[in-house]
Amino acid sequence: MKIAVLRERFEGESRVAATPETIAKYIALGAEVAVEKGAGEASRLSDDDFQKAGATIGATAAATLKGADIVLCVRRPAADELGGVNKGALLVGALDPYGNEKDVAALAKAGVAAMSMEFMPRITRAQVMDILSSQANLAGYQAVIEASKVFDRAMPMMMTAAGTVRPAKAFVMGAGVAGLQAIATAKRLGAVVSATDVRAAAGEQVESLGAKFIMTEALKDASGTGGYARELTKDEQAAQAELVAGH
């Protein structure tokens, strides 16, 4: 079985669909792995790193894909970029199908079976394949780091003989995976943190991280199924907007 790892072509995308560590595991299971030249450069992974793990380096996408049974990607490639794969080859990645029905149909027409990993169910057995949680965790961290750069002042309280710098106040909207990581990161940087969420159950998680939980009394609970929030009514949306604006 041949697994192909493509270089990402989406502007600004710095991730790669497999690392030398995971490739070594695929090879140990008996797979052949081909990585497109330069696929890991934006992630600071050289072609030599992949070769040391046992992968072959394809000079072009076509050479990498030739005879592939599985294609790994971060973002969905165009159907015409998948020439040379075996009929019925499996495309695995964050394929973003909603609103891109024509592109998905083109994949089907090309004879490719697509597996969109962002729809992996949130169940215990699938946790190790939950790409949303892992990426949201990083997004929450990065959001605070980027915000601190824009803020351009000290985040923690600083007391010196020359005076006192008061701590920054951080407000996090949403206490899902990304939000909770943002709260934890802001706290570690020394900010005074508060957060809001439409799910009452999120309050305990927010407070466990040392932040203040803010929730409007007009919205009792908007918890839906699978740990997600349900859609708010117009009145609930207005109440939530008023809460945020006044905080």
For each feature predicted by the language model, list its residue ranges.
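Electropositive, surface-exposed helix/loop patches at the edges of structured domains
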Residues: 60-83, 148-158, 233-247
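Short, hinge-like loop/turn segments at secondary-structure boundaries
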Residues: 50-54, 131-135, 211-215, 232
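Residue-level detector of alpha-helix initiation sites
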Residues: 76, 138, 176-177
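Short beta->alpha connector loops at strand-helix junctions that form conserved
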Residues: 36-37, 60-61, 94-96, 116-121, ...
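Short, charged, surface-exposed secondary-structure boundary motifs
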Residues: 67-69, 101-105, 125-128, 205-206, ...
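Glycine/serine-rich phosphate-binding loop and adjoining beta1-alpha1 elements at the start
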Residues: 2, 8, 79-169
